[in-house]
Amino acid sequence: MKTKGYLHLSPSLRINENWKSYQKKIQDPSFIQKYAFYPLMHSIIKERKYKKVNSEKHLNEKERTHNFKLNDFKFEKTAKKRPLHYATHFDALIYGYYASILNELYETALKKDLGLDDCVNAYRKIILDETGKGKSTIHFAKEVFDEIRDRSDCQEEVGVLTFDIESFFSSLDHQLLEKKWSDLLGEEELPPDHKNVFKSCTNFSYVLRDDLRIRIQKSGKQSGFDEKKLAKIRREKGFKSFFESNADFRNTIKQGKLRIYKNSFYNKEKIQVGIPQGLPISAVLANLYLLDFDKNILNKVVKDKGGFYRRYSDDIIIVANVDDLEEIKNYVENLIKQSNLKISSSKTESFVFRKSIYNQEQNSRLTSFKQVEGNERKDAPLIYLGFEFRGYNTCIKSTNIAKFYRRLISIVRRRSNRAIRNKNPNIPKAVFKNQIKKLYKKPLRDLDGENREIKQTFRNRTFLVENERNEFSMIVKPFVNKNKSNYFSYIKRCEKIFDSKIFSKQLRKKEHLLNTAIAKHLNK
């Protein structure tokens, strides 16, 4: 149990002081079966998928370009929206406790089938070596690429299939999930406490975080929250919350000032489906839901066909003989349908890897050939877990590099606008490169949105301390996490694990891009 600092509908908790009472409650089945869960907090993370493109220049077949200097743009605008729901502090403790129960049983179930433990990678701590450190997506991607290379040494052609489950979390069938949950517990039906937790995950309610702002705006910069009220609650009550009490929360709803929404995930038959993404229990439920699917793929593809199978959440990859690809593809799609899920047809891809001559000396190397409607597209990369693999090389996914560059440009634009607003006629306006570099070298986890500056390297930990007037004031204690990762340390880890220097070369344009961005935004 850890103290969390985020704002929610109910009070933040003092775990260090009251952990025994919290533990007693969450481990009491009779308490949990009657417990009324709070509404979740809902927000949406938008991930930009396509850049502006020029209709005449630098236009490839996918209508994408990464050229920063072009001005004659049209828009090919798409954004991936990921809905996130997160629970109140106490509810999160309950979800975390029941997630630990299910996760222990799930891990035991994986180890009962030889090879199944290796197939499922996401949301699990898979120990790397005797140091106790866990594997990362870098290790998982390398294992797949190494498998393709190893097979190419003894096979003329190696086949690869990739699948993506469409809207995974928001499409889980409730009846199937409940059955798999009770089966894992070894029960005919869920015990009352588990049943109540299940209902809170499937028949959930939520509020929109933006509805708690001072003014609700459909576009433009969002207004802030009622900082005067938040400060008053902190000072007088000694906790962080949008509301000072349950009565305050209920009155706000009764007065029509805050709307409560119900689970909005429905299938084509208008039947409610899905679980929230963002709860401490969501990950293990997603893995549990596909447990039988993973077992069937292991038996059919790995054991019967001699294939190689890995699933990372909703990303599926299979390495097999080329002659078996069509049969395996149909089998996977039919099996997913039995789970009342759907494979994204636009993200289903087929590859053949084989040796190909690449120079006048007739030298050959392992090369990827993407299979597209009966044709082959040479050198089209296999994209998996943020990497592009062409057989003869592995590099960071180009869109991830572009995202890093966009963040850099965003920082320059904000700093330039600030310099222009604050300019003194006697002082030349300037943006200092070293300050920019310090910002874009900050930890990956501190990146707060595509168009916002990066947060500080250290994290301020705040504590509410009662003073002699029986009021609470905020005490700030800086905390430096030396293990935080930034984009450059990630690149170094890639180079170490893959034993390749190609990754740092992908960032060779950063200085040029920085200078170009400064020249453009500072002199506009």
Q: Could you tell me what each predicted segment is?
A:
Residues 119-125, 309, 317-320, 349-359:
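Beta-rich nucleic-acid/ligand-interaction surfaces
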Residues 51, 56-96, 113-132, 162, ...:
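Short, conserved non-catalytic motifs in the polymerase core
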Residues 1-77, 494-524:
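Non-catalytic, polymerase-adjacent accessory regions of viral genome-replication enzymes
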Residues 199-253, 346-432:
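A conserved non-catalytic segment of reverse transcriptases
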Residues 273, 277-280, 365-524:
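Active-site and adjacent loop segments of nucleotide-processing enzymes
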Residues 328-336:
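Short amphipathic alpha-helices in soluble, non-transmembrane regions
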Residues 99-174, 196-216:
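Active-site-proximal segment of RNA-dependent polymerases
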Residues 155-312, 317-329, 379:
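Conserved polymerase palm-domain catalytic core
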